[in-house]
Each structure stands twice: as structure tokens, then as C-alpha cells.
UniProtKB/Swiss-Prot annotation:
Cellular component annotations (GO), alphabetically ordered: membrane; plasma membrane
Further comment: Most taste cells may be activated by a limited number of bitter compounds; individual taste cells can discriminate among bitter stimuli.
Record topology, Cytoplasmic segments: 29-40, 110-129, 205-234, 286-307
Organism: Homo sapiens
Pfam families according to UniProt: TAS2R (PF05296)
Phylogenetic lineage: Eukaryota, Metazoa, Chordata, Craniata, Vertebrata
Domain of life, per lineage: Eukaryota
Protein name: Taste receptor type 2 member 41
Keyword Protein biosynthesis listed: no
A GO molecular function held by the record: G protein-coupled receptor activity
Lipid bilayer topology: Multi-pass membrane protein
Amino acid sequence: MQAALTAFFVLLFSLLSLLGIAANGFIVLVLGREWLRYGRLLPLDMILISLGASRFCLQLVGTVHNFYYSAQKVEYSGGLGRQFFHLHWHFLNSATFWFCSWLSVLFCVKIANITHSTFLWLKWRFPGWVPWLLLGSVLISFIITLLFFWVNYPVYQEFLIRKFSGNMTYKWNTRIETYYFPSLKLVIWSIPFSVFLVSIMLLINSLRRHTQRMQHNGHSLQDPSTQAHTRALKSLISFLILYALSFLSLIIDAAKFISMQNDFYWPWQIAVYLCISVHPFILIFSNLKLRSVFSQLLLLARGFWVA
């Protein structure tokens, strides 16, 4: 029974990974083609293609890592393979968190109806900052990854050359992984998460008040404008839930509560990668350009299937 349940979660994780890789790859291909055609991208498209690329790579790295260690039965407490994976995983996770934050800020300054002078100034200036913010996010993520490697490398170097006894190696790994890294990661990931949370809550509150004002002025729930605002609210709330779930999952994952030998490992991996697999579809269906290309592909696939 346990083996069948594990197989079910492995299959579900595989399906989720394939969908995430396909959706993020689709976003990158569509916007990349437009970039090559016109030589430039709008600020929103810059963030979307950056977010799609980082999520595509993150999902790919995570999937390969999970199945490699599952198949090889490699001990998860150390080794060069783990170092190689964590370097890429930390970099891509950090970049993805920052890109999501800038996406929420851009949505906020473009859509939210706030009349404060600082917000109006930010509304005018922020789109021009987007390329530099994306580049800065990549540099920050790279520096953070190097710091993690610099702190972690001496311990694993000692582990590899077997200078520590087995008990000492275990104590070092447990102490660093369980007590030091989670707090450090919490501090680092809390910065983009706070930016995301503030901007998304401002936007949700602004849309909610605007929708209530429209209903108070006699607009029915079936009014196209009211429905558009309602859909936007639902999309933002789902983004908030998925992002918060991803943040909490990564913090708990950093604490190493669930190892690869644990029965709940595969369900937990589904929770960790849920946001980067599901949210791309929300972006596709809420973006006119992406939705149009996606609909054309569905029509082509349907015509091919019927033929």
C-alpha cells in the first residue's frame, strides 16, 4: 500500500514538473520570439521572460535532482553532487523570488489607484528601472549563492577527505543545515517576500475598493468591467496564495524536517514546486498576448488530432 501511494505521488510530481516546464518554456519562447522580432520588450514582458526562464531552469534542476538521487540511492547528507545541485538551486530560487516581487510591484504601480505623491512618482519611474532591477536581482542572487558555497564548502571538503569521524560529520552537517542555514535563508528570502507582500496587498485592496465602488454606483456583477476586476482580484489572490505557499515550503525545506528517506518526501516536493508549475498558467491566461498564442496552438493541436 505504501509503495503504491509513493508511486502515485511520484507520478503526480512528474506530471506537475512536465506541465511547469512546458508552461514556462512556452512563455520564454513566445516572448523570446517577440524580442528577436522587434529588438525590445515591454517592462512587463521583460519580467515575464526572466521569471519564465528562471522557473524553467529551477523546475528542470529540481526534477533531475529528485530522480537522480532517488534512482542512485545516494546518501543525501553530503557529496559533490549535492553541492552542485545546491549552487544552482539557491541561485535560481533567489532570482525567482526577486522576479516575482518585481512582477507584483509592476502590477501595483500600473493598476492600483493610489493618489499619494510618492506612489505617483514611482508609477512614472518604475517601468524604466525594470531592466536594471532584473540585472541587480541576478547579481544579488549570484553573490548570495557564492556566500552559501563559501560557508558550506569547508565542511563538505572535510567530509570528502574523511578527516572527520562519522559522528562528527553528522554533527557538523546537522548543526549547519538545521540551525544556521534556515535562519540565513529566512533573512535573505524575507526581503523579496516583504516587497511582494506589500505591493500585492496594496493592489488587492485598491482593486477591492474599486470593485465595491462600481457596485455601489449601480454596476451589476454581470457588468463586463466588474467581471474584469473580479477576475483580476482572483488572479492576484491565487498568486499571493501560491507565492506564500512556496515561501513557507522553502523555509521548512531548508530546516531539513523531511529527508529523501521520509514517506512524505514526494508530497512535500509537490508542495515546494507547486507555485512554479501552476502560476505560469495563470500568467498565460491573464495575458492577452500569451493567451492568443496559446489558443492558436490549441486550435492547431485540435485540428491535427481531428485530422
